[in-house]
Amino acid sequence: MELHFLGTGAGVPAKKRNVSALAIRFLERNGTVWLFDCGEATQHQFLHSPLSLAAVEAIFITHLHGDHILGLPGLLSSRSFQGAETPLDIYGPKGLEAFVIQALETTKTKLRFPIRFHVLAEGRIRDEEKLSVDALALDHPVESYAFRIKEQDKPGTLDAEALKAMGVPPGPLYAQLKKGETVKLADGRIVNGSAFLDESIRGRTVVIAGDTAPVKAMEAFASGADVLVHEATFASNKKDDAHLYGHSTIADACALAKRAAVGQLILTHVSSRYARNENEYRDEAAALLPNVIIAEDLFVFELEKAGRKKRD
């Protein structure tokens, strides 16, 4: 699982930071991509990455401010122009569908692929065999959400040698036992599969928060996550301004990461006021949480299986 930070700035584009966009590429799913927010020029950032527009399967929009959605019509148009025909799911607050449809109709853009729009609400918004996505409402001047992407836990390794020693021959029964099921052998013996399984492998969890002032419910929502991607628009000396406009400071994000016991905090949505000199911003973050990462455009964070991680 790779997190590709395509845009890490706040409000307006800057020379080194484009506006908000983050893509997750699922290597175990043939490179399928989920995109979170789509600020202006996000499709340009795709050109500087190994990602393909055709691989985008779902788009999740945290809120309807322009720096998070103005790149969406162009990206959809280019995805179609490049020949993609697979359906696309788009999740976002009420009003997103109207924005997209109006932009496409005004520009006389016809897409090769169908779009399935989903209006966001708190709770489970996507449920697959191995992945789920939950949403949590945040605190911002417009409706804004955080997303929790969670893999299902995987069964532990089956102790085949112990089963063979018991006289249980390899075959279809092993598939049932690996699921932890109880099976009856031909000789009448009952075998409980869970007794022959190692501990299950915990699925990975990534939490991505949209623009927000501190929200108490985020602590439980992000609890134990392998990765928390959180905005830190301002340094902590701008706390009053941050909260007034529905944003967080470095200290807010770091405190949340500590309370929620997350494995890795990655800060994004950095105000352009720090463009000329980010040293103080970075120094504050490092002092509050030594392993914190401040994402830059095109930075890639790889979260390996079983929660192992590495950065590029």
Curated annotation (Swiss-Prot):
By its UniProt entry, which SUPFAM superfamilies does this protein fall under? Answer: Metallo-hydrolase/oxidoreductase (SSF56281)
Q: Where is the active site?
A: D67
Instruction: Write the Enzyme Commission number(s) for this entry.
Output: 3.1.26.11
Q: Which GO terms describe its molecular function?
A: 3'-tRNA processing endoribonuclease activity; zinc ion binding
Cofactor note (record) = Binds 2 Zn(2+) ions.
Give the binding site residues for Zn(2+) 1: H63, H65, H140, D211
Pfam family, any one: Lactamase_B_2
Per its UniProt record, the required cofactor names are: Zn(2+)
Q: Tell me the InterPro entries matching this sequence.
A: Metallo-B-lactamas, RibonucZ/Hydroxyglut_hydro, RNase_Z/BN
Keywords linked to the UniProt accession = Endonuclease, Hydrolase, Metal-binding, Nuclease, tRNA processing, Zinc
Per its UniProt entry, what is the enzyme's top EC class, as one word?
hydrolase
Q: Enumerate the residues binding Zn(2+) 2.
A: D67, H68, D211, H269
Similarity remark: Belongs to the RNase Z family.
This protein's assembly is summarised as: Homodimer.
Name of the molecule in the record:
Ribonuclease Z
